[in-house]
Amino acid sequence: MLSMFMCNNIVDYVDGIVQDIEDEASNNVDHDYVYPLPENMVYRFDKSTNILDYLSTERDHVMMAVRYYMSKQRLDDLYRQLPTKTRSYIDIINIYCDKVSNDYNRDMNIMYDMASTKSFTVYDINNEVNTILMDNKGLGVRLATISFITELGRRCMNPVKTIKMFTLLSHTICDDCFVDYITDISPPDNTIPNTSTREYLKLIGITAIMFATYKTLKYMIG
């Protein structure tokens, strides 16, 4: 599944990406947007599920709104608590993975459609990703994998399975190669003891991936 997607020259292209991207939140704010009435809203949890099937009363809509608000506030609070170093990794992952998703949107959509018709477990995905990363040491593969897995969780899996997948995949993706790439990209931090630099970077890298991909859940609250 993923191996076909990686064949679309992404590995060669992503290594050369250098582009400043404005803050995601400011880009997504539309002050002129008029919110429709609840009965006219279409909630899309994934490619095959219409959330309207589960929201039949005004109470359901209000509860969904409250649940979304509380989850978003918790996520914002988590970001505020993260160390500066972790935030810098999140920024890097956001910039590069958003670039991949935008430039290869068509290729990714094809793979998402294929994946949505398959039956697979979290461990199936992890095993396939692990094989791909063992055979390909480039940064592009890792960034493309993060982008793909994030969107896959949004489209094809329920929140519980998504959390499990993100937890497992973040450890798989944050191998020594990924830590080396992130170290080269990010500015040096002289406050980290040399003896624990690699372990620290790997831990922070996992945290950054978990946070970046965890944002997917705000689209899947159910």
UniProtKB/Swiss-Prot annotation:
The outcome of changing V129L is:
No effect on the binding to host BCL2L11
Keyword annotations for this protein, in alphabetical order, are:
Host cytoplasm, Host membrane, Host mitochondrion, Host mitochondrion outer membrane, Host-virus interaction, Inhibition of host apoptosis by viral BCL2-like protein, Membrane, Modulation of host cell apoptosis by virus
Task: Give, from the UniProt record, the effect of changing V100A.
Answer: Complete loss of binding to host BCL2L11
Q: What is its induction?
A: Expressed in the early phase of the viral replicative cycle.
The effect annotated for V100F is: No effect on the binding to host BCL2L11
The protein's predominant localisation is host cell
What is the recorded phenotype of mutating G140F? Complete loss of binding to host BCL2L11
Report the coiled-coil segments: none
Q: Which GO terms describe its biological process?
A: regulation of apoptotic process; symbiont-mediated suppression of host apoptosis
Please state where this protein is localized: Host mitochondrion outer membrane; Host cytoplasm
List cellular component terms (GO).
host cell mitochondrial outer membrane; membrane
- Subunit comment for this entry? Homodimer. Interacts with host pro-apoptotic protein BCL2L11 (via BH3 domain). Interacts with host NLRP1. Interacts with host BAK.
For this entry, the protein name equals Apoptosis regulator OPG045
| Organism in which the protein naturally occurs | Vaccinia virus (strain Ankara) (VACV)
